[in-house]
UniProtKB/Swiss-Prot annotation:
GO terms for cellular component: cytosol. It comes from Pseudomonas putida (strain GB-1). NCBIfam families: PRK02101.1-1, PRK02101.1-3. PANTHER family: PEROXIDE STRESS RESISTANCE PROTEIN YAAA, PEROXIDE STRESS RESPONSE PROTEIN YAAA. Signal peptide: none annotated. GO terms for biological process: response to hydroperoxide. Belongs to the UPF0246 family. HAMAP family: UPF0246. This is UPF0246 protein PputGB1_4560.
Length: 259
């Protein structure tokens, strides 16, 4: 089983990585093509394109300018440790053991507007490029057109390497839309996390994002290989709802948020 999650806007390049192991991103030719195009934009154009403040637009213009195809631990960091935000708070990669990183490397992928698809230990230079960005390019009107069926094909390869065909989707709609289902040779398992609020179970963004990270960690630490085993997920008060679930759409409920 292969799990996919979204990246995060918030990055941490200050905290030293908890593992010295690293790999290199596999699709840097595509990343470099995007970087070359992004370098042609002024900070004001970046601000308009990405709906960023002037300060953040300037920061990312500088990031695009300093980006290099030569990745080292001095200018980059393992993706799973560089991303922060709600999903990654739930995943808490800093406390994973070395053998957990080994398992994650084979069974977890992060979708990315700039890098396409990242493995946990792939070095990543800092960037901001959300998948939904309407960046017209040589392949089409936006990043979905740029990546085309590539991400699906790479996921197919990763699944074939582990002799499986189950893809656990813990990514947002914005990012999973970059996976072309028609080109994907996999059974996709979707998951919803709902919290009780005002007498009804609802998807609350902050809690749902954190829960996606917690389930990713659960899969890694428990070495989950069968979707049926996902029903055992019971972290921080969540429990499986057979009534609300379908075979390929699992629903977990929580009556009292843990925080």
């Amino acid at each position: 089983m292969l799990t996919v999650i979204s990246p995060a806007k918030t990055l941490d390049y200050d905290t030293p990585p908890v593992t010295e192991r690293f790999t290199l991103p596999q699709y840097l030719d595509d990343s470099q093509a995007l970087i070359q195009q992004l370098r042609e934009l002024s900070p004001a154009q970046i601000s308009e394109l990405m709906h960023l403040s002037d300060k953040l637009a300037g920061l990312n213009a500088a990031r695009f300018g300093s980006w290099t195809p030569d990745f080292t631990p001095a200018n980059a960091k393992q993706a799973l440790l560089a991303f922060k935000g709600d999903v990654y708070t739930g995943l808490d990669a800093e406390s994973l053991a070395e053998d957990d990183f080994s398992y994650a490397q084979d069974h977890l992928r992060m979708l990315s507007g700039l890098y396409g698809l990242l493995r946990p230990l792939d070095l990543m230079q800092p960037y901001r490029l959300e998948m939904g960005t309407k960046l017209a390019n040589a392949r089409g009107k936006d990043l979905y057109a740029f990546w085309g069926t590539r991400i699906s094909e790479w996921l197919n390869e990763a699944l074939a390497e582990q002799g499986d065909d189950v893809l656990l989707n813990l990514a947002s709609n914005e990012y999973f839309s970059a996976v072309k289902r028609s080109a994907l040779k996999a059974r996709v398992i979707n998951v919803d996390f709902k919290d009780l609020k005002n007498g009804q179970y609802k998807i609350i963004s902050f809690y749902a994002k954190k829960a996606r990270g917690m389930m990713s960690r659960f899969v890694i630490q428990q070495r989950i290989s069968d979707p049926e085993q996902l029903k055992q997920f019971d972290v921080q008060g969540y429990y499986y709802s057979a009534e609300q679930s379908k075979p390929d759409h699992l629903v977990f409920l929580r009556d009292h948020p843990a925080d």
